[in-house]
């Protein structure tokens, strides 16, 4: 039987991870290990200064007092009964497109699976009301089945974004590149009940590059977006340019 490790960054009780676990349980044995709280924006952070505490829940899930990356690392290295065939992260409550991927704990959980040598997928639901987790779950299952039947290059993860639409309104799947957002909106300055000054980070900026071929464009037009992401952050095209510059200094 195929074994799949599921995690997320919204927390073990989030509706997205329940929808994903239930959908994948139709095709595989699923182990769900996720943070015990919302860890959105955790990126690839690891907990290095405190122990990781777990709680085995009545539904079979395991919650971890740690980050999404902690969850995947701990599950694969210690908690899983045998290695998983794949790591799937999500379904995130909100998009992970463009620059979002650098901050996303959802994407980071999948990346950790890839770091440890396993095929990995991150899936997110794009919208405000977020009513259609079922749609995202159906596409997650379809794509996972496709990967199991027809494996692709092992040096990448698939970052999937699904419009928050009924299943029959999805137009199809498009392979995309990452778009880009403007910088985040301003900091919100306020006070706590004791009068102490506090700050809230502003929301993400609007799309800067949402042209045809990007994840933003595909999702806005009713398509599921699939973007291949690599762990290697090297700007390969700039190596020779940088070498020429180094030779001059």
From Swiss-Prot:
<dbReference type="Pfam" id="PF01975">
    <property type="entry name" value="SurE"/>
</dbReference>
<comment type="similarity">
    <text>Belongs to the SurE nucleotidase family.</text>
</comment>
<feature type="binding site">
    <location>
        <position position="9"/>
    </location>
    <ligand>
        <name>a divalent metal cation</name>
    </ligand>
</feature>
<comment type="function">
    <text>Nucleotidase that shows phosphatase activity on nucleoside 5'-monophosphates.</text>
</comment>
<dbReference type="GO" id="GO:0008253">
    <property type="term" value="F:5'-nucleotidase activity"/>
</dbReference>
<dbReference type="InterPro" id="IPR030048">
    <property type="entry name" value="SurE"/>
</dbReference>
<dbReference type="GO" id="GO:0005737">
    <property type="term" value="C:cytoplasm"/>
</dbReference>
<feature type="binding site">
    <location>
        <position position="92"/>
    </location>
    <ligand>
        <name>a divalent metal cation</name>
    </ligand>
</feature>
<keyword id="KW-0479">Metal-binding</keyword>
<dbReference type="GO" id="GO:0000166">
    <property type="term" value="F:nucleotide binding"/>
</dbReference>
<dbReference type="GO" id="GO:0008254">
    <property type="term" value="F:3'-nucleotidase activity"/>
</dbReference>
<protein>
    <recommendedName>
        <fullName>5'-nucleotidase SurE</fullName>
        <ecNumber>3.1.3.5</ecNumber>
    </recommendedName>
</protein>
<dbReference type="InterPro" id="IPR036523">
    <property type="entry name" value="SurE-like_sf"/>
</dbReference>
<feature type="binding site">
    <location>
        <position position="40"/>
    </location>
    <ligand>
        <name>a divalent metal cation</name>
    </ligand>
</feature>
<dbReference type="GO" id="GO:0004309">
    <property type="term" value="F:exopolyphosphatase activity"/>
</dbReference>
<keyword id="KW-0963">Cytoplasm</keyword>
<keyword id="KW-0378">Hydrolase</keyword>
<dbReference type="GO" id="GO:0046872">
    <property type="term" value="F:metal ion binding"/>
</dbReference>
<keyword id="KW-0547">Nucleotide-binding</keyword>
<dbReference type="InterPro" id="IPR002828">
    <property type="entry name" value="SurE-like_Pase/nucleotidase"/>
</dbReference>
<feature type="binding site">
    <location>
        <position position="10"/>
    </location>
    <ligand>
        <name>a divalent metal cation</name>
    </ligand>
</feature>
């Amino acid at each position: 039987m195929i074994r799949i490790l599921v995690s997320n960054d919204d927390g073990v009780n989030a509706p997205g991870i329940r929808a994903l676990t239930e959908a994948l349980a139709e095709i595989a044995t699923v182990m769900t290990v996720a943070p015990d709280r919302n860890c959105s924006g955790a990126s690839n952070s690891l907990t290095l200064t405190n122990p990781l505490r777990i709680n085995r829940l009545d539904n079979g899930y395991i919650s971890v007092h740690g980050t999404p990356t902690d969850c995947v690392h701990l599950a694969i290295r210690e908690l899983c009964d045998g290695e998983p065939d794949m790591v799937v992260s999500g379904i995130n409550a909100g998009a992970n497109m463009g620059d979002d991927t650098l901050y996303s704990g959802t994407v980071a959980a999948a990346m950790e699976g890839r770091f440890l040598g396993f095929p990995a997928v991150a899936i997110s639901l794009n919208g405000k009301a977020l009513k259609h987790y079922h749609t995202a779950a159906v596409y997650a299952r379809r794509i996972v089945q496709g990967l199991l039947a027809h494996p692709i290059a092992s040096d990448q993860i698939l970052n999937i974004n699904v419009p928050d639409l009924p299943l029959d309104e999805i137009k199809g799947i498009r392979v995309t590149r990452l778009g880009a957002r403007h910088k985040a909106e301003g900091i919100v300055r306020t006070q706590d009940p004791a009068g102490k000054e506090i700050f809230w980070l502003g929301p993400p900026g609007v799309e800067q590059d949402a042209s045809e071929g990007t994840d933003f464009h595909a999702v806005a037009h009713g398509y599921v977006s699939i973007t291949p992401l690599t762990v290697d952050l090297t700007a390969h095209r700039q190596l020779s340019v940088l070498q020429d510059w180094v030779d001059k200094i």
